[in-house]
UniProtKB/Swiss-Prot annotation:
Function: Component of the cytochrome b6-f complex, which mediates electron transfer between photosystem II (PSII) and photosystem I (PSI), cyclic electron flow around PSI, and state transitions. PetG is required for either the stability or assembly of the cytochrome b6-f complex.
A Pfam family: PetG
Membrane association type: Single-pass membrane protein
Annotated protein name in UniProt: Cytochrome b6-f complex subunit 5
Subunit structure: The 4 large subunits of the cytochrome b6-f complex are cytochrome b6, subunit IV (17 kDa polypeptide, PetD), cytochrome f and the Rieske protein, while the 4 small subunits are PetG, PetL, PetM and PetN. The complex functions as a dimer.
Domain of life per record: Eukaryota
SUPFAM superfamilies in the cross-refs: PetG subunit of the cytochrome b6f complex
Compartment(s) of residence: Plastid, Chloroplast thylakoid membrane
Alphabetical UniProt keywords: Chloroplast, Electron transport, Membrane, Photosynthesis, Plastid, Thylakoid, Transmembrane, Transmembrane helix, Transport
Record-linked InterPro entries: Cyt_6/f_cplx_su5, Cyt_6/f_cplx_su5_sf
Family: Belongs to the PetG family.
Length: 36
């Protein structure tokens, strides 16, 4: 039961983490492009 709960949490967090990293990289790219 605990394993199922943990795997569900991990599977839910992975896409959110990837999305957050992509958004952070995108905003950083937009800022550097606007600054130059």
């Amino acid at each position: 039961m605990v394993e199922i709960l943990l795997s569900g949490i991990v599977l839910g967090l992975i896409p959110i983490t990837i999305l957050g990293l992509l958004m952070a990289a995108y905003f950083q790219y937009q800022r550097s492009k606007a600054a130059s």
